[in-house]
Amino acid sequence: MQRSDPPRPLLEMRGISKTFPAVRALAGVSLTVHPGEVHSLMGENGAGKSTLMKILSGAYQADPGGEILIDGRPISIDGPLAARDAGVAVIYQELCLAPNLSVAENIHVGRELRRGNGRRGTIDRAAMARGCQDVLERLGADFGPNTLVGTLSIAEQQLVEIARAVHTRARILVMDEPTTPLSSRETDNLFRLIRQLRAEGLAIIYISHRMAEIYELSDRVSVLRDGAYVGTLERDALSAERLVGMMVGRDISGFYKKAHAPYDPGNLLLSVRDIADGARVRGCSLDLHAGEVLGIAGLVGAGRTELARLIFGAEPRVRGEVTLAGKAFAAHSPREAIDAGLVYLTEDRKRQGLFLDMSVRENINISVCGRDARLGALDLARGAQRARDAIAALSIRVPHANVNVGALSGGNQQKVLLSRLLETKPRVLILDEPTRGVDIGAKSEIYRIINELARAGVGVIVISSELPEIIGVADRVLVMREGRIAGELGGRTDAPITQEAIIALATGSRTEASAAH
C-alpha cells in the first residue's frame, strides 16, 4: 500500500529572531504547522513562545533575516490587520472583548456592516446579528448574537472569541493557556470544540503548561528554550520526561519525587475539628503533622479554598475548633494567623497576594518590615539583603530586586510571594494552587521548596486541581465533595493515592470514606 504524502504545511516560520534592548528574545526559531493539526508549543516562561506568537499576530515585527510563509508563499505581517487578512487569529489569556457591546458587535469589531454610504453609513446591527447566527449555532453556543458580552461567563466569552476567529475565516488559530480560567466541564467543552475545528481543517497552535492537556489534544509538540528552537515530537513519541527535559535542558526523572523523610504521626501540629462557615464548608476535620505534606483534592466548588481561608482566619467560621501546636487557635484575621506561625498562599496571586506596582524587594519584605525598624526608621540595607538572599534561595529570575513584580513571569511572581511567606518563619504553610500558571522549571523549584520545608519540620497543606501534582508531592490526600471531606487516601489507610480513587471520591461514585472525618 502506497503511503500518502503529508499535507503541505499551512504555516512555516523560518529563522525568526527578535531582539529587544539588551535582550535576545528569539534566535532563529522555526515552526511548521499543517492544516487540521493541533500543534502545541511548550517552553518555560521566557522561552519565547509569546514573542513568536506576537510576531505571527503582527503585534511585534521580527528582526530582518527570517520569513513567514502561508501555503508556501512568503507574506509580510506588519500589523494585526495584516495577520487577520492572512487568516491568523489569536485568543489570549486576557480576552479582548468589549463587555458593553453585544456578541454580534464583538464578532464584527473592525468589520462592522453599515447601511448606505460606506464607512459613513449607520451600523446595521440586525445584519450583523444575522451574519453571525450560523457561526454561533455551529459552535454550539447557547446564547444569541444580541446578548451583551458582559453578562456571559468566561467560558462563554472565550467562545465569542472563537466565533470571531471562525467568522473572519481564520485558518490558523492560536490559543494561549485557554483553560486557565475554566472549570473541568468547561474545559471538556472547549476540547470538543477544538477537535471540531481541527476536523474542519483549521491549524491550531496550542500553548499550555499542563501536560495532561498536551497529551489529550496534540498531534505534534514543539519546544522552545531560552529563545531557541529545541525540537518537535510526534504524538506517539510524547512523554513527560522527554518534554520537560527539552524544556529545562536537564534530567527531571525526580520531578515529583518526595525528598523528605516520612512524617511522625505522633507529632501533631495542626488539628481541625468540625469547622464550618455556614455555606460552602459543612463540617470538616483534618490533622496535619510536623514534616507532612497533606494534599487536598476535589472538584471546583467543593470548598477547598473556603476551608483553607477558614483555617487561616480570612473568613469567619460558625463552628469548629482549631488547635495549633497543642494550643487552641482562633485567628480573627490573617495577621493573627501569621503571627502564630500559620500562613496561606492564595490561589489568586495577582489580586490577593502581590502588590504588582511595587518592587520585588518591597513585596518580599512587606510582612516582616517591622523587624527592620530602628528608632522609627526602616533599615533599608537589611531589607535589601533579605531580598537578595530570597532571590538566590528560590532561584527567582530577575535582573535586580528593585524591578516591579508586575513585570515578572507567573512563575517568578509565585516565587516572590512564596518568599514573602517564608520570611515569616511559618510552622504551617497552606498552598492554594501553588503552581497554577507557572512553567515547568518554576514548578520544579516549588516542589523542591515544599520538600525542604517538610524536611525542616514544617507542616504543608497543598490544594491543587492537578492530580499528578497532588499524587506526586503529598504523603496523604483528603478529597472534598460538596463542602465535606469525602475520604482519605494514603497515610495510615490502605487506600493508595491514585487518580481513579481521587476522582471516585470527588464525584461521589465512591462514597465510602477511608477514614472518618
From Swiss-Prot:
Give a Pfam family name.
Answer: ABC_tran
Outline the subunit composition: The complex is composed of an ATP-binding protein (RbsA), two transmembrane proteins (RbsC) and a solute-binding protein (RbsB).
Domain of life, per the record?
Bacteria
One of the entry's Gene Ontology molecular-function terms is: ATP hydrolysis activity
Major place of localization?
membrane
- Subcellular location, record wording: Cell inner membrane
This protein's UniProt keywords: ATP-binding, Cell inner membrane, Cell membrane, Membrane, Nucleotide-binding, Repeat, Sugar transport, Translocase, Transport
Q: Give the protein's function.
A: Part of the ABC transporter complex RbsABC involved in ribose import. Responsible for energy coupling to the transport system.
ABC transporter domain sequence ranges:
11-251, 263-507
Query: What family does the entry list?
Result: Belongs to the ABC transporter superfamily. Ribose importer (TC 3.A.1.2.1) family.
Naming one, the record's GO cellular component terms include: plasma membrane
Reaction(s) catalysed by this chain, per the record, are: D-ribose(out) + ATP + H2O = D-ribose(in) + ADP + phosphate + H(+)
Write out the residues that bind ATP: 43-50
Instruction: Describe its membrane topology.
Output: Peripheral membrane protein
User: Main EC class of this protein?
Assistant: translocase
Name of protein: Ribose import ATP-binding protein RbsA
Enzyme Commission number(s): 7.5.2.7
